[in-house]
Design a protein with these regions (language model features):
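Acidic, serine/threonine-rich low-complexity disordered tracts
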Residues: 16-107, 112-208
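Bacterial N-terminal signal peptides that target proteins for export
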Residues: 1-7
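C-terminal motif of bacterial Sec signal peptides marking the signal peptidase cleavage site
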Residues: 11-14
């Protein structure tokens, strides 16, 4: 995974660091205001559709750049770049801390587009992290976290929320929202590195 992480860091070394100026754009009715039935599957967005991304107080559309197998590359107008694999955010660039790579240790159903069952799950991930300038001495490879995806709770407002609690090399909580009618993932809030806010994603509503 080191070679892939180094390639990612070099490829994106020209991305600027998001510095709090705000991501420009008028938001569609995102978040809890969007009825679940209007949202497309987050793990498999329709071709050409943008994601709506929220990072702290900043928000804006993230447009598809390219695809490599199951991975999708996205870029926001202010230069923040991230990669998704299924529902997982697996790499970032353009922030003070970069997630160079995230690899599953064992099975991770959230990296697939298939619906997730209601039972709790134990998951592990290996993370590669670096500073924004990608200097080798700042890189940390093979940082392992152990996670528990909590069992499914009763739906509220047509949504099922699943909470993933992780500890180990880093301690954080991820949240995933599924449409109750078909258990399709439509929204997520994910940790993407130390000292940066979580990244919240959903597929942008057409015409928004």
């Amino acid at each position: 995974m080191k070679a892939a992480a180094l390639s990612w860091a070099l490829m994106l070394s020209g991305c600027g660091v998001l510095g709090g100026a705000g991501l420009i754009g008028s938001a569609p009715p995102a978040g809890q205001m969007v009825p679940p039935e209007q949202l497309a599957p987050l793990a498999a967005p329709p071709p050409g559709r943008a994601l709506w991304a929220e990072l702290g107080q900043d928000a804006g559309p993230a447009h598809p750049v390219r695809a490599e197998g199951p991975r999708r590359f996205w870029r926001m107008d202010q230069g923040f770049v991230f990669v998704t694999e299924g529902a997982r955010v697996v790499a970032t660039a353009g922030l003070p801390t970069m997630l160079l790579a995230s690899a599953p240790i064992g099975e991770d159903p959230l990296r697939r587009a298939a619906p997730l069952g209601p039972a709790p799950l134990r998951l592990s991930h290996s993370l590669d992290l670096a500073g924004a300038d990608g200097r080798p001495e700042q890189m940390r490879f093979g940082q392992v976290v152990q996670c528990r995806l909590e069992p499914e709770e009763p739906a509220i407002g047509g949504l099922i929320e699943r909470v993933e609690i992780c500890e180990g090399a880093a301690a954080f909580t991820n949240r995933f929202w599924f449409r109750a009618a078909d258990r399709v993932l439509i929204r997520s809030e994910q940790w993407i590195g130390r000292d940066v806010p979580p990244l919240r994603l959903e597929v942008a509503v057409e015409g928004g």
